[in-house]
A protein has these predicted regions:
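Central cavity-lining transmembrane alpha-helices of secondary-active solute carriers
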Residues: 17-36, 247-259
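Helix-to-loop junctions at the C-terminal end of transmembrane segments
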Residues: 29-43, 256-268, 350
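Intracellular juxtamembrane helix-capping segments at the cytosolic ends
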Residues: 83-97, 307-322
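Extracytoplasmic gate region of multi-pass secondary transporters
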Residues: 119-128, 198-247
Length: 394
C-alpha cells in the first residue's frame, strides 16, 4: 500500500482502499454465478477459468502500469479467485467427510498461509535486487529479465510478472491433468434459483454470511494497514521491517493453522472460536496502543489468533444447514466481499480521524465473530478425540 500511494500520488488512504475493494467486490459478483457454471460445465473448466482470470489480470497490469489498470487488474483477479473458492469448498467437504470438514478447511488455510508468508519476502527481495540506486546488470538471468520489463521507479511491479509465471504453470497443470468425475450429493450441488431463494429466507444464512464478512474484514483490515500504521506511529520502514511484519503475520497464520488442525481434533470448534476471538481483541489493543516493540510483536501475532476463524465459521455454517450446501457455499464465498468493505471502513475512518481510530473498528468485526462461538448450533459437530484415548494401548 505505501508503494502504491507513493507511485500513483494517491491523496488519501481511501483511494488506496479501492484496490482491495475492487478485488473483493468481485467475490460478491462472481461467487453465486460460479456455482451455477459448475453445475452446467463441471469442475475442471471452472477450475481452469479460475486460474485464467488472474493470469489475464496480472499480465494486464504488468504491461500497463496505471492506477485504473491496477483497479481493473485487481477486479479480474478477484473474479478468478471467487471461481476457485466456489469450486474447492464443497469438494473439500465431500472428499474429507462432513465431520472432518473443519479440519480439511484448516489444512487449506494452512497452504494459503504458506503462500501469504512467502509473498512479502519475495516482495522485499525483488525491491532490494531491482532498486534503481543499486541495481547493476549481471545479477542473474531472471533478475536481469525482470529489470528489463519492469519500470525502474516501480520495482514492485516485478511481483506481477512472478505471479504471471506461476499462474501459467497452474494453467498448464490443470489443462493436461485428468480430472476425475466427482459426483456431488444433490444437496452439495450449487442448485437452482429456488435453492438460493430458500436459503435467503433463513436467518442463520445471513448471520453466517455476516460472520465470513467480518472475518475477511479483520484479516484484510489488519494485514493491509499494519505496515502503514507502523510507519505513521513508529517510523518503521514499510519496504523492510514493515514488509517483514506483514510476512510474519501470514507466517504465524500458517503456524496457527497447524496448531488449529491439532486443536480441532481435541476441542469443540465453538470453544476454539471463543478463545481465538478474545485473544485477537487483546492483541489488537496491544498493537494499536503499545510501544513500537509491542506493536511489532502484536500485529503479526494477530495472524496466529485469527488463523482458525475462517475454517471454523465456514464449517459451522455448512454443518448448520440440512440441505443446499453447494448453494450455501456460494453465498458464503460472496461474503468475502468483506475484504472490500473492511478496508474501506478503516480507510474512511482513518481519513476522517486517524488510522488508529480506523483500525479500532476491526474490534467490532472480531466481536461478532467471537459471538458466533456462543450462538451457533450446528447439526453436525466437529469430530474430536479424548487425549487419554490417544495414549491407550492397542
Amino acid at each position: 500500500i505505501p508503494d502504491i500511494i507513493h507511485n500513483f500520488n494517491l491523496s488519501d488512504l481511501a483511494m488506496a482502499g479501492f484496490i482491495p475493494t475492487s478485488f473483493f467486490l468481485a467475490y460478491a459478483i462472481m461467487s453465486i454465478p460460479a456455482g451455477l457454471l459448475i453445475d452446467r460445465f463441471g469442475e475442471k473448466p471452472i477450475l481452469f477459468g479460475g486460474f485464467l482470470m488472474p493470469f489475464i489480470g496480472t499480465i494486464l497490469f504488468a504491461c500497463m502500469h496505471t492506477y485504473p489498470m491496477l483497479l481493473a487488474s485487481s477486479f479480474i483477479i478477484g473474479l478468478g479467485m471467487a471461481m476457485l473458492q466456489t469450486v474447492l469448498n464443497p469438494l473439500q467437504r465431500t472428499v474429507g467427510g462432513e465431520e472432518n470438514y473443519a479440519f480439511i478447511a484448516e489444512l487449506a488455510q494452512f497452504m494459503f498461509g504458506i503462500a501469504s508468508f512467502l509473498s512479502p519476502l519475495v516482495y522485499t527481495y525483488l525491491i532490494r535486487e531491482l532498486d534503481p540506486a543499486t541495481y547493476t546488470a549481471g545479477k542473474g538471468f531472471f533478475i536481469d529479465l525482470l529489470a528489463d520489463i519492469t519500470p525502474r521507479e516501480m520495482p514492485w511491479v516485478s511481483l506481477y510478472w512472478v505471479f504471471t509465471i506461476l499462474l501459467l504453470v497452474m494453467l498448464i497443470a490443470v489443462g493436461v491433468s485428468r480430472f476425475p468425475k466427482i459426483e456431488l450429493k444433490e444437496d452439495e450441488k450449487s442448485g437452482s434459483k429456488d435453492s438460493y431463494l430458500a436459503l435467503f429466507k433463513q436467518k442463520y444464512v445471513w448471520l453466517f454470511f455476516l460472520g465470513i464478512f467480518c472475518y475477511v474484514s479483520t484479516e484484510q483490515g489488519t494485514s493491509i494497514f499494519m505496515s502503514t500504521f507502523l510507519e505513521q506511529y513508529h517510523g518503521v520502514n514499510p519496504q523492510t521491517d514493515g514488509a517483514q511484519a506483514v510476512s510474519y503475520f501470514w507466517g504465524l497464520m500458517t503456524a496457527g493453522c497447524l496448531v488449529g488442525m491439532i486443536l480441532l481434533k481435541l476441542i469443540d470448534s465453538k470453544r476454539l472460536l471463543q478463545i481465538s476471538g478474545i485473544l485477537t481483541i487483546i492483541l489488537l489493543l496491544s498493537a494499536l496502543f503499545g510501544s513500537k516493540e509491542v506493536s511489532m510483536l502484536a500485529f503479526p501475532a494477530v495472524g496466529f489468533s485469527i488463523s482458525m476463524m475462517y475454517s471454523i465459521v465456514f464449517s459451522l455454517a455448512l454443518n448448520s444447514a440440512s440441505q443446499h450446501h453447494g448453494s450455501f457455499a456460494g453465498i458464503l464465498c460472496s461474503a468475502i466481499v468483506g475484504g472490500a468493505g473492511g478496508p474501506m471502513i478503516v480507510s474512511t475512518l482513518a481519513d476522517a480521524t486517524s488510522l488508529r481510530t480506523g483500525m479500532l473498528f476491526i474490534l467490532v468485526f472480531v466481536g461478532y465473530i467471537t459471538f458466533i462461538g456462543f450462538w451457533a448450533r450446528p447439526l453436525i459437530n466437529n469430530k474430536t478425540v479424548r487425549l487419554k484415548d490417544l495414549f491407550k494401548q492397542r
